[in-house]
């Protein structure tokens, strides 16, 4: 049981770990070696769509619970407040809203690594800043992978524009979106 699972430690923060994982996913020689051994590489965090799907469901389920408990009427809009680092959980609520869940406002709670808060306020995403170790390590992220998925939707599903922002983030450590996004 669990003989094909390994745990390893890294020196660094979440961003360092996630960068390494993404590199493994995109390294052809690793994919070839895994295929030779009839194996797949997977991630259990929110860079994997399989993690977001049940989160979408629990927003819908929570809304139904509020209706069934008489806290709100069917059709009433709710506010969603999520402590956010990699942007996956709150993105799931956004996808639920695209499916018809009536949401009034999305609130991204942050810690001192407030790259998302600054981005939402200014339209500038800048990872070139100090990283702070806090008591909320899952929020200790300077590169929020799931924000790319939101930007794709907000850009009208424009993969070229989205890719441009992500390339700028990779090469310069920052990008800026236009006011219409």
Model-found features: residue ranges?
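Domain-scale recognition of functional cores that engage charged ligands
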Residues: 19-20, 32, 36-97, 101
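Active-site/ligand-binding loops adjacent to catalytic centers
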Residues: 2-51, 56, 112-181
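Active-site histidine-anchored catalytic micro-motif
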Residues: 1, 82, 89-91, 100-110, ...
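Short alpha-helical "patches" and their helix-cap loops
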Residues: 71-84, 105-111, 159-173
């Amino acid at each position: 049981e669990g003989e094909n699972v390994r745990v390893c430690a890294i020196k660094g923060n979440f961003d360092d770990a996630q960068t390494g994982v993404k590199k493994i996913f995109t390294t052809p020689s690793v994919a070839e070696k895994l295929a030779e051994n009839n194996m797949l590489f997977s991630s259990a965090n929110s860079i994997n769509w399989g993690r977001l799907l049940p989160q979408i469901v629990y927003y819908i389920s929570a809304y139904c619970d509020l209706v069934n408990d008489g806290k709100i009427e069917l059709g009433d809009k709710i506010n969603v407040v999520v402590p956010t680092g990699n942007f996956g959980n709150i993105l799931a609520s956004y996808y639920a809203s695209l499916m018809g869940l009536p949401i009034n406002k999305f609130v991204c709670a942050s810690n001192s690594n407030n790259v998302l808060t600054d981005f939402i306020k200014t339209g500038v995403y800048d990872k070139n800043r100090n990283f702070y170790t806090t008591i909320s390590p899952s929020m200790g992220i300077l590169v929020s992978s799931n924000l790319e998925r939101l930007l794709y939707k907000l850009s009208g599903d424009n993969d070229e524009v989205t890719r441009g922002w992500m390339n700028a983030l990779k090469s310069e450590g920052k990008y800026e979106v236009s006011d219409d996004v």
